[in-house]
Amino acid sequence: MKHTVEVMIPEAEIKARIAELGRQITERYKDSGSEMVLVGLLRGSFMFMADLCREVQVPHEVDFMTASSYGSGMSTTRDVKILKDLDEDIRGKDVLIVEDIIDSGNTLSKVREILGLREPKSLAICTLLDKPSRREVDVPVEFVGFSIPDEFVVGYGIDYAQRYRHLPYVGKVVLLDE
């Protein structure tokens, strides 16, 4: 399928928003008194996670999960599979799930449910991109970088069939007439 990628959110805007999210997260957790863990959902969140953890100014651990509901195309499936679980115990800790993009909410709802059973002190969600118009499951999201329209986006860690993760901006995929 022939397509092009148009810049939707430039790199400078992303960096500025992540700095602001870091300040908000720091403010929320600075007096918690508990250990904090940022849980990045791979693969898409890795760039966001790396930049965000440098902006969060409270001591924190970093861990990762891989949960998948996407195939190699442009649509989501309803099946959610945990492909890689956390390496560390989160019991009694403040846990912040870091996601690249929330679409239907199915994946995040399942991850939140699984992590909630592990008895964290608190459980919150931070996403770079949110598509509220696509939501099928109500998931509380405490920290949102950008709310975006229902466009297929790539870049800044987000892929299309494993391509475009390297882009320093978020772009929308525009299909071309063949």
UniProtKB/Swiss-Prot annotation:
GO terms for cellular component: cytosol. Mg(2+) binds at E99, D100. It catalyses: IMP + diphosphate = hypoxanthine + 5-phospho-alpha-D-ribose 1-diphosphate; GMP + diphosphate = guanine + 5-phospho-alpha-D-ribose 1-diphosphate. Its cofactor is Mg(2+). Pathway: Purine metabolism; IMP biosynthesis via salvage pathway; IMP from hypoxanthine: step 1/1. Pfam families: Pribosyltran. GO terms for molecular function: guanine phosphoribosyltransferase activity; hypoxanthine phosphoribosyltransferase activity; magnesium ion binding; nucleotide binding. SUPFAM superfamilies: PRTase-like. Homotetramer. Belongs to the purine/pyrimidine phosphoribosyltransferase family. Purine salvage pathway enzyme which catalyzes the transfer of the ribosyl-5-phosphate group from 5-phospho-alpha-D-ribose 1-diphosphate (PRPP) to the N9 position of hypoxanthine to yield IMP (inosine 5'-monophosphate). To a lesser extent, can also act on guanine leading to GMP, but shows a highly less efficient activity with xanthine. This is Hypoxanthine phosphoribosyltransferase. It comes from Salmonella typhimurium (strain LT2 / SGSC1412 / ATCC 700720). The lineage of its organism: Bacteria, Pseudomonadati, Pseudomonadota, Gammaproteobacteria, Enterobacterales. The gene is hpt.
